[in-house]
Amino acid sequence: VLADPEVEAVSVCTPNNVHPTISIDALRAGKNVLCEKPAARTYKEALEMQKVQHETGKVLNIGVVNRFNDSVNLIKKYIDDGKLGNIYHVHASFRAHRSIPGLGGAFTTKAIAGGGALIDWGVHYLDIVMYCCGDPKVKTVTGEAFCELGKDMKGYAYTDMWAGPPKYDGTYDVDDSVVGMIRTEGPVISLHGAWAQNIGENECYIDFMGDKGGIRLQYGKDFTVYSSEYGALTEYKPVFKMRDHFQNEIDAFIDCIKTGKKLPSHIDTVIITAQMMQAIYDSSEQHKEITLG
């Protein structure tokens, strides 16, 4: 594939541990790359991918598909137009009752995946927050990652398992739950995520809280706007056409190759998410707040 001059673009949809190698090899072979999220297992690996992109000048976009989600882009317009006022706090919840994927397999092996709930699900939520809030500069990060419910693999009770079935002779050494707080030059961002928890309800949403209004986005669905007007509280759901955001992403990738237009999913834009996730893991391991320069 890399030696074929007719191949202009490569889509990398492999396990996380080979994202950097394949993407870098493709870039150096003169191919444009759309690499699935997360960019890599670590911030260091993501930086190496970015370095090679700069050297080659080819496209390197990361599969943060929500940047092509019509619901997310409408929320961004609300915020950019000042409809919510000053956004002072954003909270992301990505918690499931029992949703550890492929217990004992690639998803739960740190050497392959790089992490668990944070790097698999949290990457989407953090990316949405940063995108909608205008990519504010990050100052400090604190967090804690837990490996609790899945470590006793044979004792882990579940009703369904995506990417299954379980491999009880495999490895489980990643986070199944995570909490964090990120201070930026814009809003404070808090997060609580879990592949698995001993609470029955799934809670997958993002709350944007401003001094003029607020928005709750139900992940993958629509959103509700909360505000006040003429002394009365208001609450409404915008109605709009939702296109397939995966198709939007692919169409935009092809278009940027043709036009040279830099997309919101370019490695330069989204690498901050890799840095934040790395800082949460570092904070958890070192039991201290991490300052980002």
Describe the residue ranges of each PLM region:
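Short, Asp-centered acidic motifs that coordinate Mg2+ and/or phosphate
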Residues: 8-9, 89
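Short glycine-/small-residue-rich Rossmann-like dinucleotide-binding loops
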Residues: 6, 14-15, 195
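Structural detector of well-ordered beta-strand residues that form the stable sheet scaffold
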Residues: 34, 59-61, 91, 142, ...
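A structured beta-alpha segment of the ubiquitous adenosine-cofactor-binding alpha/beta core
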Residues: 1-7
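Beta-strand-loop-alpha-helix segment that lines the small-molecule cofactor/substrate pocket
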Residues: 9, 15-67, 82
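Contiguous beta-strand/loop segments that form the cofactor/metal-binding neighborhood of enzyme cores
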Residues: 127-222, 250-261
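C-terminal helix-rich "cap/oligomerization" subdomain common to oxidoreductases
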Residues: 9-12, 47, 51, 55-58, ...
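Predominantly a Rossmann-like dinucleotide-binding segment in NAD(P)-dependent oxidoreductases
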Residues: 66-171, 287
